[in-house]
Amino acid sequence: MHQSHSILTVCFVASLLIVAIIERPSQGAEPVPVMNKDRAAAFARLALKGLGKEYPNKLDHVLSGPADVKSPLALHPVFYGSYDWHSSVHGHWMLVRLLRLFPDMIEATEIRHVLGGHLTAENVTAEVAYFGRKESKPFERPYGWAWLLKLAEELNGWDDPDGKVWAKNLRPLADIVVSRYLEFFPKQTYPIRTGVHPNTAFGLTFAHDYGQSVGDARLVRLVDERARAYFGADADAPAGWEPSGADFFSPTLIEADLMRRVLPSGEFPTWLSRFLPGAAKGQPHSLFEPATVTDRTDPQLVHLDGLNLSRAWCMRSIASALPADDPARGALELAAARHSHAGLEHVASGDYAGEHWLASFAVYLLTTAPAK
């Protein structure tokens, strides 16, 4: 009984910590919270708690025979923690991002220890070998691919001795992921428009960012071409059907967030007005109001906390890509603020179902500059 009481107390205090450092909305426009060292520390501790935690673990692993029955650590010596491979990847990304922003944070030494222990050349070689299995062709496509490239992008842009070593070590895995993009997406005739991991628009979005950051013209051309082919003629998005019960992306908004990267600045507002004609009026209502989460211990229902966070970053960036006098801009900015507060309040719920991944979405929201 005493141990259970202690665990509940720790979870409650962790939840209060996150909530206490998020500004409450004002009576008028709600300012989107900004990152500071206290928030960074709270988010980092959530990731540090999970990245070395091998179990519980949800493997995406195809067995070709008895010899393929292995532990998560044996299969994925870098990305074995945080419940699943992709959550481990974006947990690593989050720690790198926070360390870059707050190099003197109290958790910095522990963060460097964890990253240095995981991102070794030997460990990455094993991850590359896993991708080389015939059965692993569709492994983590495209959600995990996208986050792996985001991690590589973060490391590549960091002028730090450790960061340079880790970037070099990770490069072979980033290269094989890029090759998977170049091989697969020309064959995918139709986009996947779901609000979860297979979403095509999200997969292309982070690939576009990576391609631009490293000067990979082939990858950028591929994303531009496929985005236009998949989404260029879209109109009247059925956004009133959103959200689905386990979404962590809005199919409508994540598509628009991709297209504001791909289309020239003069074309995007016209495309958006055709695609989401009710945006200036905050319609449809179900898209512009935060989703309701009824059970944060359920690994599917808690996805909706992530939806609120990803909607916020999409709305903010979409709004910033519009002219100052565009009538949709204000509605999107207000909705982004509402979604930010709704999502950030529940990053630390006390349950691993959300805590193993939501902090990464929160950090992406709070540390990624809106489009200009």
Language-model segment annotations:
Residues 74-77, 89, 98-211:
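Extended ligand-binding groove/face enriched in aromatic
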Residues 9-20:
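Bacterial N-terminal signal peptides
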Residues 31-35, 45, 49, 89-105, ...:
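Well-ordered alpha-helical scaffold segments within catalytic/enzyme domains
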